[in-house]
From Swiss-Prot:
Region (Disordered): 150-169
Domain of life, source organism: Bacteria
Entry annotated with the keyword Zinc: no
InterPro entries associated with the record: NusB-like_sf, NusB_fam, NusB_RsmB_TIM44
Keyword RNA-binding: yes
GO MF: RNA binding
HAMAP family assigned to the protein according to its UniProt record, in alphabetical order: NusB
One BP annotation, GO: DNA-templated transcription termination
Gene Ontology, cellular component aspect: cytosol
Keywords: RNA-binding, Transcription, Transcription antitermination, Transcription regulation
Function: Involved in transcription antitermination. Required for transcription of ribosomal RNA (rRNA) genes. Binds specifically to the boxA antiterminator sequence of the ribosomal RNA (rrn) operons.
Organism whose genome encodes this protein: Rhodococcus jostii (strain RHA1)
Gene that specifies this protein: nusB
Protein name listed in UniProt: Transcription antitermination protein NusB
Family: Belongs to the NusB family.
Length: 169
C-alpha cells in the first residue's frame, strides 16, 4: 500500500511540475518540450535544480503534441467563457487532465480528474476547483470513445504501414 501511495505522490509531483512548465512556457512564449528537456538536463548538472521526473516530460510532450485538439475539446465545454479568458494555470491544468483522459491509458479517469481538481486547489483561485471539475466531468463522458477511436486509428495506421512496405518491395 505504501508503494502505491508513493507512486501516486510521485505522479502528483510530476503533474504539478508539468503545470509549472506549461505555465512558464506560455508566459515566456517558449516551447514547453524544450523547456522541460533543458531543465531535465540542467538538473543532472546542477544540484540546485530539482530533478524532472520522466512522467513530467511525457505529459508536457503529450500536451504540446496534441495542444490544438486539447484546446478544441476544452473550448467545446466552456459556457460563456473563452479559453483565453481562463487563468493560465487553469488552462495548463485542464490541458494536462484532458491529455491524461484521452491518452494516458494507465491513469484511471477518476484519478486524472481528482488530480486536476487538487492542483487547482493548490495553485489557482477559490473558484477554479469547481470549474475544473465541471469541465472535466463533461470531458470524462467522451474520453472512452476518444480512446477507442485513437486505438482503432493506430491499428489501421500500423496495418497500412506494414502493407505499403510489402507492396513496395
Amino acid at each position: 500500500m505504501s508503494g502505491t501511495h508513493k507512486k501516486l505522490g510521485a505522479r502528483h509531483k510530476a503533474r504539478k511540475r508539468a503545470v509549472d512548465f506549461l505555465f512558464e512556457a506560455e508566459a515566456r512564449d517558449l516551447d514547453p518540450v524544450d523547456l522541460a528537456t533543458e531543465r531535465a538536463e540542467l538538473s543532472g548538472k546542477d544540484d540546485s535544480v530539482a530533478p524532472v521526473a520522466p512522467y513530467t516530460v511525457t505529459v508536457v510532450t503529450g500536451v504540446a503534441e496534441n495542444l490544438d485538439r486539447l484546446d478544441e475539446v476544452i473550448r467545446s465545454h466552456l459556457q460563456d467563457w473563452t479559453l483565453e479568458r481562463l487563468p493560465a494555470v487553469d488552462r495548463a491544468i485542464l490541458r494536462i487532465a484532458v491529455w491524461e483522459l484521452f491518452h494516458a491509458t494507465d491513469v484511471p479517469p477518476v484519478v486524472a480528474v481528482d488530480e486536476a481538481v487538487e492542483l487547482a486547489k493548490q495553485l489557482s483561485t477559490d473558484e477554479s476547483p469547481g470549474f475544473v471539475n465541471g469541465i472535466l466531468g463533461q470531458v470524462v463522458l467522451v474520453a472512452p470513445q476518444v480512446r477507442s477511436a485513437a486505438a482503432a486509428t493506430s491499428r489501421r495506421t500500423e496495418t497500412a504501414g506494414g502493407e505499403s512496405n510489402d507492396a513496395g518491395s
